[in-house]
Amino acid sequence: MNRRAVVLGSAGQLGAELVRELRARGYSAIGWDRDEVDITDAAAVENAIARFDAEVVFNAAAYNQVDVAEEEPQAAFEVNALAVRNIALACRQTDARLVHFSTDYVFDGWARHPYAEDDPTHPLGAYAVSKLAGELYAQAYLDRVLIVRTSGLFGPRGLATARGNFVELMLRLAVSGQPIRVVEDHVASPTFAPLLAARTIDLADREAWGLFHIGGGAPISWFQFARTIFEVAGLKPMLLATSEREYRTRARRPKYSALSNAKMERVGLDPMPPVRQALEGYFAERSRAVSGTPA
């Protein structure tokens, strides 16, 4: 009998990859987005999960408008925290396992080494607070829960909902012909969505419960990441380095939020590849996704 899995937020970059990877591994996987299951409705969530008789639920749904969340924190909290409580309670009632995704933004960025899972959290804005609250709800209600923090997600599928994808933003700006300014004093671990999906399912299959970090390869500044994007894409726009002081945003963001994958590797998973290799994979997958060619 096939294992049965539900993916919430299946229209997004990560959700689309989870559905694809689960099915490739022989799971009977179904994906639901907000139009199909309202995760802020506790009864609707429990009924849907029970009806499908899911063994494992992957929650890739999130409110991720970091700056807008400063103006509407309740909306962020409803999706990133209260809805996670709904999902966790539904999993407890149906005896399903939960895999939930969180963010590097739970840290304040004062570290100068990749963050480990046991480093203290200190979220700086409404979005980050809501994501940390979601982690706490999941841990409070479930023993068999896997929480995966990631950073700077970029994925070729779900492009209709991926306007926040940094790679696509850079490509759009390159076409404009205008100078492109990117901060060089913020460092993260940009993460290729198909690899994140695969490593996460590996952890779930091993029943590696608890908190794990899965980020891209070596830490990289957003300016360096943009430069690598253009090199891999064969583009030569005018790219200029700027700083946080010159490029103000409504929400505060951690200046350093690179994630350590050491715990993931200790349980036997392969290291994440360098960012250039991940970008080469991105553009190859992107071409297939845009053309409709199967992977």
Q: Model regions: which residues?
A:
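NAD(P)-dependent short-chain dehydrogenase/reductase
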Residues: 136-188, 194-195, 202
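C-terminal amphipathic/interface module of NAD(P)-dependent oxidoreductases
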Residues: 255-295
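Catalytic helix-loop patch of NAD(P)-dependent Rossmann-fold dehydrogenases
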Residues: 71, 78, 82-86, 106-148, ...
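N-terminal Rossmann NAD(P)H-binding glycine-rich loop of SDR-like oxidoreductase domains
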Residues: 3-22
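Adenosine-cofactor binding site in Rossmann-like domains, unifying the SAM/SAH pocket
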Residues: 23-47
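Mid/C-terminal beta-alpha module of Rossmann-like enzyme folds, strongest
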Residues: 199, 206-250, 255, 283-286, ...
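SDR active-site strand-loop-helix element
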Residues: 8, 32, 60-61, 98-103, ...
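NAD(P)H-binding glycine-rich loop region in Rossmannoid oxidoreductase-like domains
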Residues: 42-79, 90-92
